[in-house]
Amino acid sequence: DIDDTITKTSQLTGRNLLDNWYFVNPINQRGLDSYANSSGLYGIDRWKILSGLSNFCYVEVNDGYVAIVNANTTPGNYIYIAQYFEYEITPAGVSRTVSIMDKDGVVRSSTNSNGINWVYGDGIYIYQGDAKSLNIRLDAGKRLNMKAIKLELGSSQTIAHQDIAGNWMLNEIPDYGEQLARCQRYYQIFATQSVRPTNKDDFRPVMRTTPALSTITIGSTTYYTASAEL
């Protein structure tokens, strides 16, 4: 029956190698609804903008999805957004699958044993530059709206299944607190400067390395940050 099918599907769900992958309710410690940045800056947690096109790469946090936008319409001008890892997450020669549920609930996926290299759509590419990253490239004028993204080992996508009516249903909704803790290994924010540690081992959770300390302003309030981002 349907309940039995869902149970079996859940049992076979592979581990998502990505952090902050559920864009219906993303980890967004910097607190903005839209990020327009040039190369090397972060918007939502763990996703780094890689673009020389200052203020043409937008990451928008919308109601129920995140959009990546290349607002430059001149052919040949592309942008990247990437997630980096501390270690190699996809062993050489092992099949890996990337899958995306878009804003409309449609799921598409691609499998490769030599590093993800997927033409997701006209002018949109998802690939691994190496075993320690996942990159999304958008050509001029392109937009990608996502509810969720998954990178996993194996030759099948397990991000979602179809119900009896053919609708795609996510196989799991991640625990927000767990995802926040994973992101806080790389970035933490404090309302009070005096309670922000300086040694990585004094943070909770412990940070990846000794962080760079700074401030950000959200609305009219100053917050105190610690970044150990890659």
Feature map (PLM): residue ranges:
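Extended, low-complexity, turn-rich repeat/linker tracts enriched in Gly/Pro/Ser/Thr and Asp/Glu
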Residues: 90-95, 103-107, 142
